[in-house]
Amino acid sequence: MKLTYQGEIPVKKNTQRISKHGGIYKPKNAADFEETIGWEWRLTRQEPVPGTFKIVSGAFYIPERKDLDGCLTSLLDALQYAGAIENDRLLRSINDLKKIPLEKGAQERLEITIEAYT
């Protein structure tokens, strides 16, 4: 499965908030990211990756201040939400994953290839 996304990538640790009534909710940018990743995946018309999986290659074009692991966690949660993977805990291997710092004002994006783990 190959996926390319262009837009803001939220960092996972900052995606849940507590309301004034004590409930937990996702901010709009995190919910929008999950929804958009789901549509991007559906548009590729690729089959879901069954069972365990590996990241063959991935590149996150993000600002220096963002953590790569937080962005990866957000992406895996979004892919699970969309049904592209069963569960993000089934990740078994990461072969090649890069963080490429952006110049100020440049657009964030990601490119990732995921395959079944054999």
Regions found by a protein language model. Name each.
Residues 1-118:
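Acidic, proline/glycine-enriched N-terminal capping motif
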